Amino acid sequence: MLGMIRWVVEGTLVAMLLSAIRRETGMIFFYNQYQLGGWIHRYLSWGEMCYTRTLKMVKRSKFFRKQLNEDGFGRINDSGPKRRGRDQSQYSSRFVELD
């Protein structure tokens, strides 16, 4: 039983990671090429829901605060590493056009 709980928790964490990648970069997992596309879509939707709920919980928590420049994690308004190639601003945070 504990092994199954572990797999569910790890699967949820991977789905949440994919959700965070989608929200930060606009890149999505190309699941339409697989026969299990419907199942994969539901799995990714589960990750989206868990990620959204986690963010809401963190924002309400007294244990978290906004990042300051003195924290040493880079600039606050930095959008991450420099992107090469195409400008990513053309993509919305919800839907991405794939080449």
Curated annotation (Swiss-Prot):
Record Pfam families: Mitofissin
Places the protein is found: Cytoplasm
The keyword Cytoplasm appears for this protein: yes
Annotated signal sequence range: 1-19
Keyword tags: Cytoplasm, Signal
InterPro entries (UniProt xref): Mitofissin
A GO term from the CC aspect: cytoplasm
Record region (Disordered): 71-99
Organism superkingdom: Eukaryota
Misc remark: Present with 358 molecules/cell in log phase SD medium.
Protein name per Swiss-Prot or TrEMBL: Uncharacterized protein YKL018C-A
